[in-house]
A protein has these predicted regions:
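The alpha-helix within a helix-turn-helix
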Residues: 17, 28, 57
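A short, Lys/Arg-rich alpha-helix, primarily the initiator
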Residues: 1-19
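Short, charged recognition helix plus adjacent turn
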Residues: 2-4, 58, 68-72
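Residue-level detection of the helix-turn-helix DNA-binding "recognition helix"
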Residues: 18, 32, 43, 72
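Base-recognition residues in the alpha-helical recognition helix of bacterial helix-turn-helix
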Residues: 35-40, 51-54, 69
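DNA major-groove recognition helix of helix-turn-helix/homeodomain DNA-binding modules
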Residues: 49-66
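Short alpha-helical DNA-recognition segment
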Residues: 21-40
Length: 72
C-alpha cells in the first residue's frame, strides 16, 4: 500500500475515533484489532487489508467507501 495512503487513512481513523470520543481500548474491543496494530494504523505504518477496513469503518459509523473517500 502506498505510504501516503497509509498516512491519510491513519490520520482519518485517529481523528474520527477521537471526535466520536472512542478510546483506543474500546475501539480495539469493538473491532477485534489489537492495540499495537491500531497504534500502527493510526501512525500510518500499518498495511490495511479489506478485512480490517470492513471492521474499522462501521466502528467509526462509516462505510468503507466513506472511509476511503477522496483518497486516490
Amino acid at each position: 500500500m502506498d505510504e501516503r495512503v497509509k498516512q491519510i487513512l491513519g490520520r482519518r481513523v485517529e481523528e474520527t475515533r477521537k471526535d466520536l470520543g472512542i478510546s483506543k481500548v474500546d475501539f480495539c474491543v469493538a473491532t477485534g484489532i489489537s492495540r499495537p496494530y491500531l497504534d500502527r494504523i493510526e501512525d500510518g505504518t500499518a498495511n490495511f487489508t479489506l478485512k480490517v477496513l470492513f471492521k474499522i469503518a462501521p466502528a467509526l459509523g462509516m462505510t468503507v467507501s466513506e472511509l476511503l473517500e477522496g483518497i486516490e
